[in-house]
Protein backbone atom coordinates (compact mmCIF):
# COMPACT_ATOMS: atom_id res chain seq x y z
CA UNK A 1 0.00 0.00 0.00
CA UNK A 2 1.23 3.49 -0.80
CA UNK A 3 1.76 5.50 2.37
CA UNK A 4 0.61 9.16 2.52
CA UNK A 5 4.15 10.55 2.34
CA UNK A 6 4.97 8.37 -0.68
CA UNK A 7 2.26 9.58 -3.03
CA UNK A 8 3.60 11.45 -6.05
CA UNK A 9 1.88 14.62 -4.83
CA UNK A 10 3.84 14.33 -1.56
CA UNK A 11 7.16 13.40 -3.15
CA UNK A 12 7.03 16.45 -5.41
CA UNK A 13 6.96 18.66 -2.29
CA UNK A 14 9.85 16.95 -0.49
CA UNK A 15 13.46 18.10 -0.41
CA UNK A 16 16.45 16.82 -2.39
CA UNK A 17 18.63 14.31 -0.59
CA UNK A 18 15.87 12.11 0.79
CA UNK A 19 15.73 8.40 0.06
CA UNK A 20 12.26 7.48 -1.22
CA UNK A 21 10.14 4.84 -2.90
CA UNK A 22 7.62 5.72 -5.60
CA UNK A 23 4.97 3.49 -7.13
CA UNK A 24 2.60 4.02 -10.01
CA UNK A 25 2.01 3.73 -13.73
CA UNK A 26 4.29 4.85 -16.53
CA UNK A 27 3.05 7.77 -18.60
CA UNK A 28 6.05 7.90 -20.94
CA UNK A 29 9.65 6.77 -21.27
CA UNK A 30 12.26 8.79 -23.13
CA UNK A 31 15.68 7.34 -23.86
CA UNK A 32 19.00 9.13 -24.13
CA UNK A 33 22.44 7.63 -24.74
CA UNK A 34 23.14 6.45 -21.20
CA UNK A 35 19.97 7.34 -19.33
CA UNK A 36 16.22 6.75 -19.41
CA UNK A 37 13.67 9.39 -18.34
CA UNK A 38 10.41 7.96 -17.03
CA UNK A 39 7.27 9.96 -16.25
CA UNK A 40 5.50 8.25 -13.34
CA UNK A 41 2.04 8.93 -11.91
CA UNK A 42 -0.03 7.26 -9.20
CA UNK A 43 -3.23 9.29 -9.69
CA UNK A 44 -2.57 11.63 -6.78
CA UNK A 45 -1.33 14.58 -8.83
CA UNK A 46 -1.84 16.17 -12.24
CA UNK A 47 1.96 16.52 -12.37
CA UNK A 48 4.09 13.47 -13.14
CA UNK A 49 7.18 12.55 -11.15
CA UNK A 50 10.27 12.17 -13.32
CA UNK A 51 12.44 9.12 -12.70
CA UNK A 52 16.01 9.19 -13.98
CA UNK A 53 17.24 5.66 -14.62
CA UNK A 54 20.89 5.33 -15.58
CA UNK A 55 21.86 2.61 -18.01
CA UNK A 56 22.95 -0.52 -16.16
CA UNK A 57 20.80 -0.04 -13.05
CA UNK A 58 18.46 -2.72 -14.38
CA UNK A 59 18.97 -5.13 -17.30
CA UNK A 60 17.94 -3.97 -20.75
CA UNK A 61 15.19 -6.59 -20.94
CA UNK A 62 13.61 -4.91 -17.89
CA UNK A 63 13.97 -1.46 -19.47
CA UNK A 64 12.12 -2.77 -22.51
CA UNK A 65 9.13 -3.52 -20.28
CA UNK A 66 8.94 0.08 -19.00
CA UNK A 67 6.36 1.21 -21.54
CA UNK A 68 3.35 3.50 -21.31
CA UNK A 69 0.79 1.91 -18.99
CA UNK A 70 3.22 -0.41 -17.21
CA UNK A 71 3.07 -0.55 -13.40
CA UNK A 72 6.40 -0.05 -11.62
CA UNK A 73 7.98 0.81 -8.29
CA UNK A 74 11.21 2.77 -7.94
CA UNK A 75 13.68 3.16 -5.09
CA UNK A 76 16.09 6.06 -5.19
CA UNK A 77 17.08 9.51 -4.01
CA UNK A 78 15.31 12.78 -4.58
CA UNK A 79 17.55 15.23 -6.44
CA UNK A 80 17.03 18.74 -7.72
CA UNK A 81 15.52 18.57 -11.19
CA UNK A 82 17.05 20.34 -14.14
CA UNK A 83 13.83 19.93 -16.10
CA UNK A 84 10.85 22.25 -16.26
CA UNK A 85 7.69 21.69 -14.25
CA UNK A 86 9.10 19.99 -11.17
CA UNK A 87 11.53 20.90 -8.40
CA UNK A 88 12.70 17.35 -7.74
CA UNK A 89 13.07 14.04 -9.51
CA UNK A 90 14.13 10.54 -8.46
CA UNK A 91 17.58 9.22 -9.24
CA UNK A 92 16.76 5.51 -9.35
CA UNK A 93 18.82 2.87 -7.52
CA UNK A 94 16.39 0.03 -8.16
CA UNK A 95 13.29 -0.50 -10.27
CA UNK A 96 10.70 -3.27 -10.37
CA UNK A 97 8.15 -3.86 -13.12
CA UNK A 98 4.96 -5.22 -11.55
CA UNK A 99 2.76 -5.30 -14.63
CA UNK A 100 3.52 -4.81 -18.30
CA UNK A 101 1.42 -3.07 -20.96
CA UNK A 102 2.08 -4.26 -24.49
CA UNK A 103 2.49 -1.06 -26.56
CA UNK A 104 0.99 -2.83 -29.56
CA UNK A 105 -2.31 -3.22 -27.73
CA UNK A 106 -2.43 -0.68 -24.88
CA UNK A 107 -4.94 1.92 -26.13
CA UNK A 108 -3.80 4.94 -24.10
CA UNK A 109 -0.63 5.86 -25.91
CA UNK A 110 0.89 9.33 -25.66
CA UNK A 111 -1.56 11.29 -27.75
CA UNK A 112 -4.75 13.25 -27.17
CA UNK A 113 -7.79 10.99 -27.16
CA UNK A 114 -11.32 12.24 -27.74
CA UNK A 115 -13.75 12.07 -24.85
CA UNK A 116 -15.93 9.78 -26.95
CA UNK A 117 -13.05 7.34 -27.34
CA UNK A 118 -12.28 7.44 -23.63
CA UNK A 119 -15.92 6.68 -22.77
CA UNK A 120 -15.49 3.38 -24.59
CA UNK A 121 -12.49 2.65 -22.36
CA UNK A 122 -14.15 3.00 -18.97
CA UNK A 123 -11.71 0.52 -17.42
CA UNK A 124 -8.70 2.59 -18.50
CA UNK A 125 -9.82 6.20 -18.91
CA UNK A 126 -9.13 6.88 -15.22
CA UNK A 127 -5.41 6.84 -16.13
CA UNK A 128 -5.77 9.69 -18.61
CA UNK A 129 -4.83 13.23 -17.60
CA UNK A 130 -8.37 14.47 -18.19
CA UNK A 131 -10.10 11.93 -16.03
CA UNK A 132 -7.39 12.06 -13.41
CA UNK A 133 -8.27 15.74 -13.00
CA UNK A 134 -12.04 15.18 -13.14
CA UNK A 135 -12.07 12.42 -10.55
CA UNK A 136 -9.76 14.27 -8.17
CA UNK A 137 -12.25 17.14 -8.32
CA UNK A 138 -15.05 14.64 -7.75
CA UNK A 139 -13.29 13.36 -4.63
CA UNK A 140 -12.72 16.89 -3.34
CA UNK A 141 -16.35 17.85 -3.91
CA UNK A 142 -17.55 14.84 -1.91
CA UNK A 143 -15.26 15.86 0.96
CA UNK A 144 -16.50 19.46 0.72
CA UNK A 145 -20.13 18.38 0.96
CA UNK A 146 -19.62 16.36 4.12
CA UNK A 147 -17.48 19.11 5.67
CA UNK A 148 -20.12 21.78 5.00
CA UNK A 149 -22.90 19.87 6.71
CA UNK A 150 -20.84 18.34 9.50
CA UNK A 151 -19.46 21.78 10.43
CA UNK A 152 -23.07 22.94 10.82
CA UNK A 153 -24.16 20.05 13.01
CA UNK A 154 -26.16 18.14 10.38
CA UNK A 155 -26.60 14.38 10.75
CA UNK A 156 -25.64 12.20 7.77
CA UNK A 157 -28.49 9.78 6.99
CA UNK A 158 -28.50 6.66 4.80
CA UNK A 159 -31.81 6.34 2.99
CA UNK A 160 -33.00 3.19 1.18
CA UNK A 161 -32.11 2.41 -2.41
CA UNK A 162 -35.23 0.23 -2.75
CA UNK A 163 -38.49 2.07 -2.11
CA UNK A 164 -42.22 1.57 -2.46
CA UNK A 165 -42.96 5.28 -2.94
CA UNK A 166 -42.31 7.82 -5.67
CA UNK A 167 -40.88 10.98 -4.12
CA UNK A 168 -41.24 12.93 -7.36
CA UNK A 169 -44.63 11.66 -8.50
CA UNK A 170 -43.26 11.48 -12.02
CA UNK A 171 -43.51 7.73 -12.52
CA UNK A 172 -40.10 7.35 -14.25
CA UNK A 173 -38.89 4.57 -11.99
CA UNK A 174 -36.97 1.31 -12.31
CA UNK A 175 -39.03 -1.56 -10.96
CA UNK A 176 -37.42 -4.13 -8.67
CA UNK A 177 -38.87 -7.63 -8.81
CA UNK A 178 -38.00 -11.31 -8.54
CA UNK A 179 -41.10 -12.36 -10.51
CA UNK A 180 -40.89 -13.93 -13.96
CA UNK A 181 -42.15 -11.07 -16.08
CA UNK A 182 -42.08 -13.31 -19.18
CA UNK A 183 -44.82 -15.49 -17.71
CA UNK A 184 -48.13 -15.32 -19.63
CA UNK A 185 -49.95 -14.96 -16.32
CA UNK A 186 -50.47 -11.42 -14.95
CA UNK A 187 -47.84 -10.59 -12.35
CA UNK A 188 -49.10 -10.89 -8.77
CA UNK A 189 -46.84 -8.62 -6.77
CA UNK A 190 -48.24 -9.80 -3.45
CA UNK A 191 -46.11 -12.87 -4.08
CA UNK A 192 -43.02 -10.86 -4.94
CA UNK A 193 -39.97 -10.63 -2.67
CA UNK A 194 -41.28 -7.55 -0.82
CA UNK A 195 -44.95 -8.40 -1.25
CA UNK A 196 -45.67 -5.21 -3.22
CA UNK A 197 -44.47 -3.04 -6.08
CA UNK A 198 -40.96 -1.75 -5.32
CA UNK A 199 -38.60 0.52 -7.22
CA UNK A 200 -35.10 1.93 -7.22
CA UNK A 201 -35.30 5.24 -5.40
CA UNK A 202 -35.67 8.52 -7.28
CA UNK A 203 -34.92 10.52 -4.13
CA UNK A 204 -34.14 10.04 -0.46
CA UNK A 205 -36.10 13.14 0.49
CA UNK A 206 -39.21 11.56 1.99
CA UNK A 207 -37.18 9.27 4.23
CA UNK A 208 -34.88 12.17 5.16
CA UNK A 209 -37.96 14.06 6.38
CA UNK A 210 -38.48 11.27 8.93
CA UNK A 211 -35.06 12.01 10.40
CA UNK A 212 -35.57 15.78 10.21
CA UNK A 213 -38.57 15.30 12.51
CA UNK A 214 -36.26 13.77 15.12
CA UNK A 215 -32.79 15.25 14.55
CA UNK A 216 -33.78 18.66 13.06
CA UNK A 217 -30.98 19.05 10.49
CA UNK A 218 -30.00 16.07 8.34
CA UNK A 219 -28.64 15.32 4.87
CA UNK A 220 -28.37 12.39 2.50
CA UNK A 221 -25.73 11.72 -0.14
CA UNK A 222 -26.34 8.66 -2.25
CA UNK A 223 -27.37 7.13 -5.58
CA UNK A 224 -30.71 7.82 -7.23
CA UNK A 225 -32.26 6.38 -10.36
CA UNK A 226 -34.53 7.73 -13.11
CA UNK A 227 -35.90 5.54 -15.91
CA UNK A 228 -36.16 8.46 -18.31
CA UNK A 229 -35.29 7.64 -21.91
CA UNK A 230 -33.24 10.83 -22.22
CA UNK A 231 -30.06 10.37 -24.20
CA UNK A 232 -28.71 13.89 -23.69
CA UNK A 233 -25.45 15.37 -22.34
CA UNK A 234 -27.32 16.37 -19.15
CA UNK A 235 -29.10 13.16 -18.13
CA UNK A 236 -28.11 9.90 -16.47
CA UNK A 237 -30.20 6.94 -15.34
CA UNK A 238 -28.04 6.57 -12.21
CA UNK A 239 -26.55 9.56 -10.43
CA UNK A 240 -25.83 10.90 -6.96
CA UNK A 241 -27.93 13.38 -5.03
CA UNK A 242 -27.27 15.52 -1.97
CA UNK A 243 -30.49 16.23 -0.09
CA UNK A 244 -30.55 18.21 3.17
CA UNK A 245 -33.76 18.45 5.19
CA UNK A 246 -34.23 20.97 7.99
CA UNK A 247 -36.94 21.29 10.64
CA UNK A 248 -37.97 24.77 11.80
CA UNK A 249 -37.03 26.03 8.33
CA UNK A 250 -38.97 28.07 5.78
CA UNK A 251 -38.34 28.92 2.14
CA UNK A 252 -36.09 31.90 2.93
CA UNK A 253 -33.92 29.81 5.25
CA UNK A 254 -33.74 27.20 2.51
CA UNK A 255 -32.53 29.75 -0.04
CA UNK A 256 -29.91 31.08 2.37
CA UNK A 257 -28.54 27.59 3.01
CA UNK A 258 -28.47 26.69 -0.69
CA UNK A 259 -26.50 29.83 -1.55
CA UNK A 260 -24.00 29.27 1.26
CA UNK A 261 -23.71 25.61 0.28
CA UNK A 262 -22.85 26.30 -3.36
CA UNK A 263 -20.31 28.98 -2.51
CA UNK A 264 -18.67 26.69 0.04
CA UNK A 265 -18.35 23.84 -2.48
CA UNK A 266 -16.70 26.04 -5.08
CA UNK A 267 -14.32 27.60 -2.57
CA UNK A 268 -13.24 24.21 -1.23
CA UNK A 269 -12.56 22.75 -4.68
CA UNK A 270 -10.74 25.87 -5.89
CA UNK A 271 -8.42 25.67 -2.88
CA UNK A 272 -7.95 21.88 -3.03
CA UNK A 273 -7.67 21.31 -6.78
CA UNK A 274 -5.96 24.36 -8.25
CA UNK A 275 -3.64 22.51 -10.68
CA UNK A 276 -6.47 20.24 -11.83
CA UNK A 277 -8.71 23.23 -12.53
CA UNK A 278 -5.88 24.89 -14.44
CA UNK A 279 -5.51 21.77 -16.59
CA UNK A 280 -9.26 21.61 -17.28
CA UNK A 281 -9.34 25.33 -18.08
CA UNK A 282 -6.47 24.93 -20.52
CA UNK A 283 -7.97 22.02 -22.44
CA UNK A 284 -11.74 22.33 -22.02
CA UNK A 285 -13.00 25.67 -20.72
CA UNK A 286 -10.84 28.81 -20.78
CA UNK A 287 -13.52 30.67 -18.78
CA UNK A 288 -13.61 28.10 -15.96
CA UNK A 289 -11.74 30.10 -13.33
CA UNK A 290 -13.74 33.23 -14.12
CA UNK A 291 -16.98 31.28 -13.84
CA UNK A 292 -16.09 29.80 -10.45
CA UNK A 293 -14.87 33.12 -9.07
CA UNK A 294 -18.11 34.71 -10.26
CA UNK A 295 -20.24 32.28 -8.28
CA UNK A 296 -18.13 32.59 -5.13
CA UNK A 297 -18.29 36.39 -5.14
CA UNK A 298 -21.86 36.96 -6.34
CA UNK A 299 -24.91 37.74 -4.27
CA UNK A 300 -27.52 35.44 -5.80
CA UNK A 301 -30.49 37.24 -7.38
CA UNK A 302 -33.88 36.17 -6.00
CA UNK A 303 -37.04 36.49 -8.08
CA UNK A 304 -40.41 34.78 -8.25
CA UNK A 305 -41.45 32.51 -11.08
CA UNK A 306 -44.03 35.11 -12.14
CA UNK A 307 -41.31 37.77 -12.34
CA UNK A 308 -39.11 35.38 -14.33
CA UNK A 309 -41.85 34.68 -16.87
CA UNK A 310 -42.47 38.41 -17.22
CA UNK A 311 -38.77 39.04 -17.91
CA UNK A 312 -38.72 36.28 -20.53
CA UNK A 313 -41.86 37.53 -22.26
CA UNK A 314 -40.57 41.11 -22.36
CA UNK A 315 -37.14 40.04 -23.62
CA UNK A 316 -38.04 40.24 -27.28
CA UNK A 317 -36.21 36.96 -27.78
CA UNK A 318 -37.56 34.17 -29.94
CA UNK A 319 -37.12 31.11 -27.73
CA UNK A 320 -37.42 27.58 -29.04
CA UNK A 321 -39.91 26.91 -26.23
CA UNK A 322 -42.48 29.73 -25.85
CA UNK A 323 -42.92 31.11 -22.35
CA UNK A 324 -46.25 31.40 -20.65
CA UNK A 325 -47.36 31.35 -17.04
CA UNK A 326 -47.91 27.76 -15.99
CA UNK A 327 -45.25 26.18 -18.19
CA UNK A 328 -41.94 24.93 -16.86
CA UNK A 329 -38.81 26.88 -17.73
CA UNK A 330 -36.39 25.24 -20.14
CA UNK A 331 -32.61 25.38 -20.18
CA UNK A 332 -32.62 28.24 -22.69
CA UNK A 333 -34.79 30.32 -20.35
CA UNK A 334 -32.59 29.56 -17.34
CA UNK A 335 -29.44 30.54 -19.20
CA UNK A 336 -31.01 33.74 -20.50
CA UNK A 337 -31.86 34.83 -16.96
CA UNK A 338 -28.48 33.93 -15.48
CA UNK A 339 -26.21 34.95 -18.35
CA UNK A 340 -27.94 37.89 -20.01
CA UNK A 341 -30.32 39.48 -17.52
CA UNK A 342 -28.47 39.15 -14.21
CA UNK A 343 -25.05 37.71 -15.16
CA UNK A 344 -24.94 35.70 -11.93
CA UNK A 345 -26.79 32.86 -10.18
CA UNK A 346 -30.53 33.32 -9.75
CA UNK A 347 -32.96 31.71 -7.29
CA UNK A 348 -36.48 31.46 -8.72
CA UNK A 349 -39.28 30.84 -6.21
CA UNK A 350 -43.04 30.32 -5.97
CA UNK A 351 -43.79 28.11 -8.96
CA UNK A 352 -47.28 27.08 -10.16
CA UNK A 353 -48.36 24.10 -8.10
CA UNK A 354 -49.39 22.12 -11.19
CA UNK A 355 -45.78 21.80 -12.39
CA UNK A 356 -44.28 20.92 -9.01
CA UNK A 357 -44.32 17.92 -6.68
CA UNK A 358 -47.18 17.09 -4.32
CA UNK A 359 -45.18 17.63 -1.11
CA UNK A 360 -44.41 21.33 -1.70
CA UNK A 361 -46.17 23.77 0.62
CA UNK A 362 -49.10 25.57 -0.94
CA UNK A 363 -48.97 29.36 -0.92
CA UNK A 364 -51.89 31.51 0.19
CA UNK A 365 -52.80 32.40 -3.41
CA UNK A 366 -53.89 28.79 -4.02
CA UNK A 367 -52.01 28.75 -7.34
CA UNK A 368 -48.35 28.53 -6.39
CA UNK A 369 -46.16 26.56 -4.02
CA UNK A 370 -43.14 27.52 -1.90
CA UNK A 371 -40.67 25.98 -4.32
CA UNK A 372 -37.26 27.19 -5.43
CA UNK A 373 -34.79 26.44 -8.19
CA UNK A 374 -31.21 27.71 -8.07
CA UNK A 375 -29.98 28.54 -11.56
CA UNK A 376 -26.33 29.06 -12.45
CA UNK A 377 -24.77 30.58 -15.58
CA UNK A 378 -23.74 28.08 -18.26
CA UNK A 379 -25.59 25.13 -16.74
CA UNK A 380 -29.05 26.26 -15.62
CA UNK A 381 -30.76 24.51 -12.72
CA UNK A 382 -28.28 23.18 -10.21
CA UNK A 383 -30.49 22.92 -7.09
CA UNK A 384 -34.21 22.31 -6.66
CA UNK A 385 -36.03 22.53 -3.36
CA UNK A 386 -39.02 23.73 -1.41
CA UNK A 387 -40.64 24.29 1.90
CA UNK A 388 -42.53 21.06 2.54
CA UNK A 389 -46.26 20.91 3.20
CA UNK A 390 -46.60 20.41 6.97
CA UNK A 391 -50.43 20.70 7.16
CA UNK A 392 -51.95 17.22 7.24
CA UNK A 393 -55.27 18.12 5.65
CA UNK A 394 -53.70 20.13 2.84
CA UNK A 395 -51.17 17.39 2.06
CA UNK A 396 -53.85 14.69 2.07
CA UNK A 397 -55.98 16.69 -0.34
CA UNK A 398 -52.99 17.25 -2.62
CA UNK A 399 -52.18 13.52 -2.72
CA UNK A 400 -55.79 12.77 -3.62
CA UNK A 401 -55.68 15.38 -6.39
CA UNK A 402 -52.60 13.62 -7.78
CA UNK A 403 -54.22 10.16 -7.83
CA UNK A 404 -54.68 10.44 -11.58
CA UNK A 405 -50.90 10.78 -11.87
CA UNK A 406 -50.26 7.53 -10.01
CA UNK A 407 -50.02 8.68 -6.39
CA UNK A 408 -51.65 6.18 -4.05
CA UNK A 409 -52.81 7.53 -0.71
CA UNK A 410 -52.14 4.22 1.05
CA UNK A 411 -48.47 4.33 0.01
CA UNK A 412 -47.94 7.59 1.89
CA UNK A 413 -49.63 6.74 5.19
CA UNK A 414 -46.38 7.13 7.11
CA UNK A 415 -45.56 10.41 5.36
CA UNK A 416 -48.94 11.77 6.43
CA UNK A 417 -48.35 10.47 9.96
CA UNK A 418 -45.37 12.81 10.31
CA UNK A 419 -47.90 15.66 10.13
CA UNK A 420 -50.15 14.06 12.73
CA UNK A 421 -47.49 13.55 15.39
CA UNK A 422 -45.34 16.57 16.18
CA UNK A 423 -45.22 18.06 12.71
CA UNK A 424 -43.38 21.32 12.12
CA UNK A 425 -42.56 23.59 9.19
CA UNK A 426 -39.58 22.19 7.36
CA UNK A 427 -37.74 22.56 4.08
CA UNK A 428 -34.99 21.05 2.00
CA UNK A 429 -33.41 20.81 -1.41
CA UNK A 430 -31.63 18.44 -3.74
CA UNK A 431 -28.45 18.96 -5.72
CA UNK A 432 -27.32 16.62 -8.45
CA UNK A 433 -23.71 15.74 -7.66
CA UNK A 434 -22.76 15.21 -11.30
CA UNK A 435 -24.48 18.40 -12.42
CA UNK A 436 -22.35 20.32 -9.93
CA UNK A 437 -19.26 18.52 -11.18
CA UNK A 438 -19.98 19.66 -14.72
CA UNK A 439 -20.02 23.21 -13.43
CA UNK A 440 -16.77 22.78 -11.49
CA UNK A 441 -14.82 21.05 -14.26
CA UNK A 442 -16.16 22.73 -17.38
CA UNK A 443 -17.03 19.34 -18.88
CA UNK A 444 -19.93 19.54 -21.31
CA UNK A 445 -21.21 15.96 -21.04
CA UNK A 446 -22.40 14.47 -17.76
CA UNK A 447 -21.02 11.07 -18.85
CA UNK A 448 -17.55 12.53 -18.33
CA UNK A 449 -17.91 13.33 -14.62
CA UNK A 450 -19.14 9.96 -13.33
CA UNK A 451 -16.97 6.82 -13.28
CA UNK A 452 -19.45 4.48 -14.96
CA UNK A 453 -22.28 6.31 -16.75
CA UNK A 454 -25.63 4.56 -16.97
CA UNK A 455 -27.65 5.82 -19.92
CA UNK A 456 -30.28 4.31 -22.25
CA UNK A 457 -28.69 1.28 -23.89
CA UNK A 458 -25.47 1.50 -21.87
CA UNK A 459 -24.59 -0.35 -18.66
CA UNK A 460 -21.03 -1.43 -19.44
CA UNK A 461 -18.48 -2.00 -16.66
From Swiss-Prot:
It is found in: Cytoplasm. One of its GO terms (cellular component) is cytoplasm. InterPro entries: Aa-tRNA-synt_II, aa-tRNA-synth_II, aa-tRNA-synth_II/BPL/LPL, Asn-tRNA-ligase, Asp/Asn-tRNA-synth_IIb, NA-bd_OB-fold, NA-bd_OB_tRNA. It comes from the Bacteria. Its EC number is 6.1.1.22. One of its GO terms (biological process) is asparaginyl-tRNA aminoacylation. Disulfide bonds: none annotated. It catalyses: tRNA(Asn) + L-asparagine + ATP = L-asparaginyl-tRNA(Asn) + AMP + diphosphate + H(+). It is an enzyme of class 6 (ligase). The keyword Aminoacyl-tRNA synthetase applies. Keywords: Aminoacyl-tRNA synthetase, ATP-binding, Cytoplasm, Ligase, Nucleotide-binding, Protein biosynthesis. One of its GO terms (molecular function) is nucleic acid binding. Belongs to the class-II aminoacyl-tRNA synthetase family. Homodimer. This is Asparagine--tRNA ligase. It comes from Solibacter usitatus (strain Ellin6076). The lineage of its organism: Bacteria, Pseudomonadati, Acidobacteriota, Terriglobia, Bryobacterales.
Amino acid sequence: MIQPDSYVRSLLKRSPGESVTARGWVKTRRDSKNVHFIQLNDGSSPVDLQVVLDAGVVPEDVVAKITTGACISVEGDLVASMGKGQAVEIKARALTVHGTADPEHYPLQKKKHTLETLRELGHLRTRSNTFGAVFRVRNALACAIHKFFQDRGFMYVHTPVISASDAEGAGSMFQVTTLDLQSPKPADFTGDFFGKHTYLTVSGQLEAEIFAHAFANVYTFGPTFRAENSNTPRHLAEFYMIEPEMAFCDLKDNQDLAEAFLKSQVEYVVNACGPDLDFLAKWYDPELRKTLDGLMNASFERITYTEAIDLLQRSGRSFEFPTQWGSDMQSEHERYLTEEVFNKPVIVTDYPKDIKAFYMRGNDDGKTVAAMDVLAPRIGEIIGGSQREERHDVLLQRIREMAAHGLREEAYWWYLDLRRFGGVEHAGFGMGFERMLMYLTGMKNIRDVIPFPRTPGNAEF
